[in-house]
């Protein structure tokens, strides 16, 4: 007998926002308020989590649920418009989608590797592979549509 999707483990690998230690978190147990294994501070997955050149690949490889990455810059007006929309999306979809953010100015290696040429750029990953991309400001409904897209056959 196969497990239903609801019974399957949903794991995310996230960097602690306080000490940068990578932690594997069972998304089915978010109500238990996961804590960092190193510094013991809370890992809050109801908001976008910052990633960097140093840890993005490990976060993507260690996460079983879709990952939506926001490529942004602090000085970008449209990025500031998108920030509260992404905050709401992360809160509403916590446990189903991991929302991460990459500062494109501070992480040029990943910015170049992912060919981010406009900001904000939203990229959806499944199993560490890009499945959808959108450049520019978008609506909350479009975020759901981006995550719902089936992976491209390559």
Regions found by a protein language model. Give the residues of each.
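Thiol-based oxidoreductase modules, predominantly thioredoxin-like and allied folds used
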Residues: 51, 71, 86-109, 116-119
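Non-catalytic, surface beta->alpha helical segment in thiol-disulfide oxidoreductase systems
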Residues: 118, 123-154
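Short linker/helix segments within small regulatory modules
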Residues: 25-34
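A short beta-strand-turn-helix
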Residues: 22, 48-67
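Structural micro-motif
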Residues: 65-67, 114-123
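Short pre-active-site segment immediately N-terminal to redox-active cysteine/selenocysteine motifs
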Residues: 18, 64, 71-75, 118
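Short cysteine-rich clusters marking metal-coordination/redox-active sites
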Residues: 16-19, 36-39
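Conserved redox-active cysteine motifs that mediate thiol-disulfide chemistry
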Residues: 71-85
């Amino acid at each position: 007998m196969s497990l239903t999707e609801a019974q399957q483990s949903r794991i995310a690998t996230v960097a602690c926002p306080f000490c940068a230690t990578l932690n594997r978190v069972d998304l089915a147990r978010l109500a238990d308020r996961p804590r960092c294994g190193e510094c013991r501070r809370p890992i809050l997955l109801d908001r976008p989590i910052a990633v960097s050149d140093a840890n993005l690949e490990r976060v993507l490889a260690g996460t079983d649920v879709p990952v939506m990455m926001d490529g942004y810059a602090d000085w970008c007006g449209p990025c500031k418009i998108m920030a509260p929309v992404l905050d709401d999306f992360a809160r509403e979809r916590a446990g189903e989608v991991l929302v991460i953010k990459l500062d494109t100015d501070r992480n040029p290696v990943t910015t170049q590797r992912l060919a981010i040429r406009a900001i904000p750029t939203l990229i959806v990953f499944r199993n560490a592979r890009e499945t959808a991309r959108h450049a520019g400001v978008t609506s909350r409904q479009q975020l759901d549509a981006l995550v719902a897209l089936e992976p491209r056959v390559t």
